[in-house]
Every structure is written in structure tokens, then in C-alpha cells.
Amino acid sequence: MTEPPLPHESADDGRARLSYEDARDELIQIVQRLELGGLPLEEALRLWERGEELARVCQAWLDGARARLEAYRAPEQSAANDVSAPGSAEEHDHGR
């Protein structure tokens, strides 16, 4: 089974490949600039659009991280579910 590409590897529209931390840091700077106000409308819109793009990059990284963690946990959870706990219904049925 092959692993899905990392979010920064799937940029098929030519966007720069950013790490989660780089995207997050740039997004924070954009939010701070927008919160200060005083920007011309066109620049504010451009920054907002870039912020939306960066938020999507960050979300893709987080979704990928969650999927990787769940993939590692899945075999452990499956094995734990296969083991009958003491006092389970299965054990009670054998006592009849």
C-alpha cells in the first residue's frame, strides 16, 4: 500500500510548497495586518485571499497528520477489540 502524498507535495496548481509551520506563520502575519486595519481595499482582499489559501494548506497538513495517527492506531485498536475482557458476555455463555 502506498502512502498518499503529503499536502505540500500535491500542489498541482503551481503554489509554493509550504511546511505547516511556514504556512501558519505567514497566516498569523496576515491576520495581524488585517486586524490593524488601514489597508486599501484591494490589498486587504488580496491578503484575505492569501490567508484563505494558507488556512487550506494548514488544514491539509493537519488532516494528513490525523490520518497518519489513525493509521498507526488502527492495528492497535483492532487487536484490543479481538481480546475478550474478563467478565464479557462470551465468558458468561460458556458457564451455562
Swiss-Prot record:
<dbReference type="GO" id="GO:0009318">
    <property type="term" value="C:exodeoxyribonuclease VII complex"/>
</dbReference>
<dbReference type="InterPro" id="IPR037004">
    <property type="entry name" value="Exonuc_VII_ssu_sf"/>
</dbReference>
<dbReference type="InterPro" id="IPR003761">
    <property type="entry name" value="Exonuc_VII_S"/>
</dbReference>
<keyword id="KW-0378">Hydrolase</keyword>
<feature type="region of interest" description="Disordered">
    <location>
        <begin position="73"/>
        <end position="96"/>
    </location>
</feature>
<protein>
    <recommendedName>
        <fullName>Exodeoxyribonuclease 7 small subunit</fullName>
        <ecNumber>3.1.11.6</ecNumber>
    </recommendedName>
</protein>
<dbReference type="Pfam" id="PF02609">
    <property type="entry name" value="Exonuc_VII_S"/>
</dbReference>
<keyword id="KW-0540">Nuclease</keyword>
<dbReference type="GO" id="GO:0005829">
    <property type="term" value="C:cytosol"/>
</dbReference>
<comment type="similarity">
    <text>Belongs to the XseB family.</text>
</comment>
<dbReference type="GO" id="GO:0006308">
    <property type="term" value="P:DNA catabolic process"/>
</dbReference>
<dbReference type="GO" id="GO:0008855">
    <property type="term" value="F:exodeoxyribonuclease VII activity"/>
</dbReference>
<comment type="function">
    <text>Bidirectionally degrades single-stranded DNA into large acid-insoluble oligonucleotides, which are then degraded further into small acid-soluble oligonucleotides.</text>
</comment>
<keyword id="KW-0963">Cytoplasm</keyword>
<keyword id="KW-0269">Exonuclease</keyword>
<comment type="subunit">
    <text>Heterooligomer composed of large and small subunits.</text>
</comment>
